[in-house]
Amino acid sequence: MGSLESERTVTGYAARDSSGHLSPYTYTLRNKGPEDVIVRVIYCGICHSDLVQMHNEMGMSNYPMVPGHEVVGVVTEIGSEVKKFKVGEHVGVGCIVGSCRSCSNCNGSMEQYCSKRIWTYNDVNHDGTPTQGGFASSMVVDQMFVVRIPENLPLEQAAPLLCAGVTVYSPMKHFGMTEPGKKCGILGLGGVGHMGVKIAKAFGLHVTVISSSDKKKEEALEVLGADAYLVSKDAEKMQEAAESLDYIMDTIPVAHPLEPYLALLKTNGKLVMLGVVPEPLHFVTPLLILGRRSIAGSFIGSMEETQETLDFCAEKKVSSMIEVVGLDYINTAMERLVKNDVRYRFVVDVAASNLDK
């Protein structure tokens, strides 16, 4: 991607160190190439993995860092070879903004598994410039890694679908978890988990929410539409539910035992890990081999699957439960997210902050 224009300066909210505190930061966007679109950010969701990156929990963070990978905005400019989008269209940008495009994963429409994928932030572009995310006024993104927001999908509702939504949609499609009437467990009811309930119900599955307490029971059943609720600390109820589920999607992002949940699976059942847990998890093998059960993993989704997720949710009228906040509230929102004090996703109204004025 060659340089075609002079540099442009934008403002975002960046972390300067592992304290994770976000404050205004002015920086230069990379130059627009022939296949790039410039996106003026309108909304950006907050993901738990933003906390992981901001606080350097994986030991790979670079600062200054502008987080945000659930980006919804409007196209303001396009490169000379862009055919996919027009100026004025509403678009989304998810977790990755680049890949090698030549490996088996890229050729198989699985860009998220490319070993040379480029993260939306805390990474390096092909031209050597750092990537910065959606807590900013604008972004420059290759058209291949941009998706179209359906007209009947509210923009603020679309933001969480770009990470949380596709994170559950992709394994459901890949592992065949779409047959109406099958029984699916959702372990953990946070940002990803609540989208798991909604998308699973839209596919016609019988959904059981599994949580460590009953404090979300009423909301899970009456608001999100789950069919059943299981408290993992209730040994009697867990025993009664043994071998009752076809699948479980595990969305918990911290260390936890797997054995209680493997015991809930029927023969041939699947436990699909979706949470990023930076420490070992333990289980005994008889729980797998005596029921031909399997543990699998899935990571976000491809660009094709991301567009499918948006289109599916627009068609089925699946919406995320969000709390819209301003950039001036973002540090408080992060503190609340640490305490799990959000139902169920924060979405930042970036446009209302008038960052470049």
UniProtKB/Swiss-Prot annotation:
Q: Where is NADP(+) annotated to bind?
A: 49, 167, 188-193, 211-216, 251, 275, 298-300
Q: Which reaction does it catalyse?
A: (E)-cinnamyl alcohol + NADP(+) = (E)-cinnamaldehyde + NADPH + H(+); (E)-coniferol + NADP(+) = (E)-coniferaldehyde + NADPH + H(+); (E)-sinapyl alcohol + NADP(+) = (E)-sinapaldehyde + NADPH + H(+); (E)-4-coumaroyl alcohol + NADP(+) = (E)-4-coumaraldehyde + NADPH + H(+)
Asked if the Swiss-Prot or TrEMBL record annotates the protein with the keyword Transmembrane, the reply is: no
- Pathway listed for it? Aromatic compound metabolism; phenylpropanoid biosynthesis
- A Pfam family the protein falls into: ADH_zinc_N
Gene3D superfamilies given in the database record: Medium-chain alcohol dehydrogenases, catalytic domain, NAD(P)-binding Rossmann-like Domain
The protein's required cofactor(s) are namely: Zn(2+)
Residues involved in Zn(2+) 1 binding: 47, 69-70, 163
InterPro entries under this entry? ADH-like_C, ADH-like_N, ADH_Zn_CS, CAD-like, GroES-like_sf, NAD(P)-bd_dom_sf, PKS_ER
Q: Name one GO molecular function term.
A: zinc ion binding
Query: Which N-terminal stretch is annotated as signal sequence?
Result: none
Q: GO biological process annotations for this chain's record?
A: lignin biosynthetic process
What does the record note about the cofactor? Answer: Binds 2 Zn(2+) ions per subunit.
Q: Could you tell me the keywords of this UniProt record?
A: Lignin biosynthesis, Metal-binding, NADP, Oxidoreductase, Zinc
The yes or no answer to whether the keyword Isomerase is present is: no
Enzyme nomenclature, EC number = 1.1.1.195
- Which positions does UniProt annotate for Zn(2+) 2 binding? 100, 103, 106, 114
What function does the entry list? Involved in lignin biosynthesis. Catalyzes the final step specific for the production of lignin monomers. Catalyzes the NADPH-dependent reduction of coniferaldehyde, 5-hydroxyconiferaldehyde, sinapaldehyde, 4-coumaraldehyde and caffeyl aldehyde to their respective alcohols.
The protein's matches in PANTHER family, at most eight in alphabetical order, are given as: ALDEHYDE REDUCTASE
- Please give the subunit comment from the record: Homodimer.
Q: What family does this belong to?
A: Belongs to the zinc-containing alcohol dehydrogenase family.
- Specify the protein name: Probable cinnamyl alcohol dehydrogenase 7/8
